[in-house]
Amino acid sequence: MALLQIAEPGQSAAPHQHRLAVGIDLGTTNSLVAAVRSGVANTLPDEDSQHSLPSVVRYTQDSVLVGREAEAFSAQDPQNTIVSIKRFMGRSLEDIQSGDQTLPYIFEASENGLPIFVTPSGKVNPVQISSEILKPLVARAELTLGGTLEGVVITVPAYFDDAQRQGTKDAASLTGVKVLRLLNEPTAAAIAYGLDSGQEGVIAVYDLGGGTFDISILRLNKGVFEVLATGGDSALGGDDFDHMLQAYFAEQWQVSSASASMNRKMQIEARRVKEALTESAETTASVVDDAGTKLTLTVTRELFDSLIAKLVKKTISSCRRALRDAGVSNDEVLETVMVGGSTRVPLVRQEVESFMGKTPLTSIDPDRVVAIGAAIQADILVGNKPESDLLLLDVIPLSLGIETMGGLVEKVVSRNTTIPVARAQEFTTFKDGQTAMAFHVVQGERELVADCRSLARFTLKGIPPLAAGAAHIRVTFQVDADGLLSVTAMEKSTGVQASIQVKPSFGLSDEEIGSMLKDSMANAKEDITRRMLAEKQVEAARVLESLNAALSKDSDLLSVDERGVIEANMASLAQIASEDDADAIEAAIEVLDTATQDFAAKRMDNSIRLALKGQSVDNI
């Protein structure tokens, strides 16, 4: 939907004026920029007629090289030539260094544990490096279109978490360009194909790029793109195919401890071999080692298929899980859209066709389709197509909620809820006179906080010191169109509030999400039992807390024997509540309730007597 432009009174908003906006596919291996010109969306080439820009940045003492210029030095200066920066976005240095791949870069950890690259130009972080890739794309667009951009739509993998999405926005901010929206890559592809074909029904978008894999199941209906379910892996892509070949080269050539330069040479050759085998059944790998010896090796497509078979099967498993989440079968999928350069690999297409039961769509260049979809969306958002009723409804992959007493999870936004979304729920205080409340935001499907993923914590202060349960705190979860989560807590009588924008530092891979969902199903019965126990334990604690306060205030209303009976039942409840029997706790609460009924009546009578003291009958 278009962003409305409002003019001052007496000034024209120039509705006929075409506003400049582009879509950018900020990829792991290559990046592209696209625009709608004369009603047609296409990628914009550079002065050398190259549409893609390698996502490579090289730092020297006095310059920063980007794209092919930087890529040319990747073998001779791998330490300062940074590739696949998208893989580093939002990940901790510890996580990066614990991976299987040996990285040639010099790292330092920032205060929050995120990676800092030490280069001849100084210390830089992934956000700054990403901005260097965006700069020439923006410059290319403005030169080609002949003006300043009013905004861009940048695509991101569906499983980028909040920190990764915010980092992408920050990178764009460093270039001085306005981000109209972050758009999930599969959704962008659906826009490109949906507008071209005009189909309605269920479509699968299989997106295998250089560094990430996403599968999205979408329903197209009267211009509405609804993502029914998503899946994928933020650390699986064509780069991993290259790594399998690279490891095979090292084994065959008996390269046990290769230098960074040799590793980079093998990596480049692995990519070339992969691309050659897309068209040919056989090719020869050739690398000159550090000693000047030329190493060669014949590689067949059959061998390559055997090396990558497990990785391709992982993507099919994600497809199967996404279909199950969406509640649709293979037969209901009208088309499968192929996105990403890695979908050119014959084995990938064969496995997808075999699983889906139909030939996948490849009519739009899989390398360009995401950028084209982003350009179409940018054209709409900037107001060039105000009549367009295109809607995008992405979904939340895992439920969002907060911790309540007893370590329980209260889900506020359920998984597979379409975004943008806002949900609110009311909570109250546990203790008399409570003036603050701590909030713990979690993600997951389990019933207990210990089994879910922690996202953020914040505290609401300034709650009026009322009796337990008297204060009303409204908690609102808002997830915007870019998938960023904001949580706000407000005390209703005073209006005092606190909020937090959730920016977790770590993303979730497809395996982790799948594992969390599998665990929730496998432990559903046990989780409900544990939840019921925790709820009864919380209720017991509340009863004992309330009764202790009452005894402290009005114990003089009881005889020694009456108080002894109550305290004995309280001790019994406290003992039973520490054990794992919800039914026994409930029974003990009922026994204590019966034992305190006379005490409650005496307190009520006493309160009425005190309230009426000194009042005449006429006043009453």
UniProtKB/Swiss-Prot annotation:
Highest taxon of the lineage: Bacteria
Keyword annotations from UniProtKB, A to Z: ATP-binding, Chaperone, Nucleotide-binding
Protein's UniProt keywords contain NAD: no
Pfam families in the cross-refs: HSP70
Keyword Transport belongs to the record: no
PROSITE patterns tied to this protein: HSP70_1, HSP70_2
Biological process, per Gene Ontology: iron-sulfur cluster assembly
GO molecular-function terms, A-Z: ATP binding; ATP hydrolysis activity; ATP-dependent protein folding chaperone; unfolded protein binding
Record SUPFAM superfamilies: Actin-like ATPase domain, Heat shock protein 70kD (HSP70), C-terminal subdomain, Heat shock protein 70kD (HSP70), peptide-binding domain
Residue ranges the record marks as coiled coil: none
Function: Chaperone involved in the maturation of iron-sulfur cluster-containing proteins. Has a low intrinsic ATPase activity which is markedly stimulated by HscB.
Family membership noted in the UniProt record: Belongs to the heat shock protein 70 family.
Matches recorded under PANTHER family: HEAT SHOCK PROTEIN 70KDA (PTHR19375)
Name of protein: Chaperone protein HscA homolog
Organism: Shewanella pealeana (strain ATCC 700345 / ANG-SQ1)
Lineage: Bacteria, Pseudomonadati, Pseudomonadota, Gammaproteobacteria, Alteromonadales
